[in-house]
């Protein structure tokens, strides 16, 4: 993407506040025109002094324009600052909203720290560009566009010096941009690596400390910082060279203007006031050209991060649903997977040609080895992904034809990882339903066997749980997650190994709550426990993305297939309160009795 396209796209974000932006632009143009008039008026004052004429009128006009310039500059600075700050926060919020709608696979591939780093650095760069556009860029362009024609009307010979100076600045800028383009892109990559390392180590600080990795991880960060310096310094060298060349060209131009001016005055071809005006023009032009050079530097520096941000914006925009998508209402819970196929890109993993039907109120247990596609099946139900082939229907409606918001409103999920926010206990439960009353929150906690341990905390329901629930035990985290699902009160329930971290006593309490919750609700359970599978109306055995077997527990156990093999191998966890029966090597005695199982 060219530098001009990047700049233009950055400016398009200001269109949301069109009136404020236009007002700032008009004020900036007025400031530029007033600034241009100052050297002319100053020259007239000097000429009036030289001619011993009336200096009061030009002085008064000069003072009036100076006062107006000050007020306009303050107005522009104040308005531009506020507008740039508002748009920075606005773009950050809009982009954040799109980011959190992206599928999990996108976040896993890109990395959370990468997306966060891109968002923060890009919005900071956009803020700087917007601010400089309204404060300096526009006034600089207007000033340069009017300065040369005005100077040419005064003296063509002196104007050539200013034109040559402008050409030299342009040539130097083009040279440096060409030399630093690839280097600046490399700098941005090293910035990402450094940020990712910091984020990775801090999020795993317990591992870093327990394995005595503090010195090693710090040294790794030093290495990343050194690589960043090695990539950054050549770029900085080119811009330092550009600054020196620009300063040399501007100094030489001032000398030429003074020498030519003095020569023309002695020959009677120019007045002293006109020479003074040209000196003011030269100083003004040098200042504006320096601003242009700084602007190019800013844009080149921001180029890589903005290109990455725009690519991220385009990717998230493609995920946005069209307006007026139908909602899924009055869900009964009849669910059909009709020849559903989905495969993760370049992985060979997914689910293939899966078909089954679940009647309203039925409980489905999904079992199978690791990587069988159990979680993928659930993610497809919630439209984290859309099928590549086939269709998923709820109450006869294809889920792709309804809004994700309404679909997910109909599904309450208890994830394997509880996924708690660094907020209070009540706020975490209230994620299930934001407008729930305190009494409803407490009732959900009681149903999930969480109320007693919450009250035992120092702040009760106002206790902050820490980052990802770090201040709670594994069982406490899962009970809050279950309370959240209970509070949501959705017609479809998904439990992803929801009771795996609970002790026997607590699990029994939670199981009763879940049984009550799942009554008359369509329930999917990714199950590792025998009791869960036994009580299910339908068991789906997944392996390598294929639905190998389906039916009731007894049907599959008696069939002598893969599910029966899983039972014989003890692949489902026994309840802790049930004593394990010994297995004699070489015998056909199973670890627990299964009616009709085949030896």
UniProtKB/Swiss-Prot annotation:
Membrane-topology descriptor: Multi-pass membrane protein
Organism superkingdom: Bacteria
Catalytic activity: [(1->2)-beta-D-glucosyl](n)(in) + ATP + H2O = [(1->2)-beta-D-glucosyl](n)(out) + ADP + phosphate + H(+)
Cross-referenced PROSITE patterns: ABC_TM1F, ABC_TRANSPORTER_1, ABC_TRANSPORTER_2, NDVA
Residues bound to ATP: 368-375
InterPro entries recorded: AAA+_ATPase (IPR003593), ABC1_TM_dom (IPR011527), ABC1_TM_sf (IPR036640), ABC_transporter-like_ATP-bd (IPR003439), ABC_transporter-like_CS (IPR017871), NdvA (IPR005896), P-loop_NTPase (IPR027417), Type_1_exporter (IPR039421)
Any one GO cellular component localisation term in the record: plasma membrane
Subcellular locations according to the entry: Cell inner membrane
Keywords: ATP-binding, Cell inner membrane, Cell membrane, Membrane, Nucleotide-binding, Sugar transport, Translocase, Transmembrane, Transmembrane helix, Transport
Pfam families to which the protein is assigned, alphabetical: ABC_membrane (PF00664), ABC_tran (PF00005)
ATP-binding as UniProt keyword: yes
Domain ABC transporter: from-to ranges: 335-569
Record GO terms (molecular function): ABC-type beta-glucan transporter activity; ATP binding; ATP hydrolysis activity; ATPase-coupled lipid transmembrane transporter activity
Description of how the protein assembles with itself and partners: Homodimer.
NCBIfam families: chvA, PRK13657.1
Family: Belongs to the ABC transporter superfamily. Beta-(1-->2)glucan exporter (TC 3.A.1.108.1) family.
Function, in words: Involved in beta-(1-->2)glucan export. Transmembrane domains (TMD) form a pore in the inner membrane and the ATP-binding domain (NBD) is responsible for energy generation.
Annotated domain remarks: In NdvA the ATP-binding domain (NBD) and the transmembrane domain (TMD) are fused.
Descriptive protein name: Beta-(1-->2)glucan export ATP-binding/permease protein NdvA
Gene for this chain: ndvA
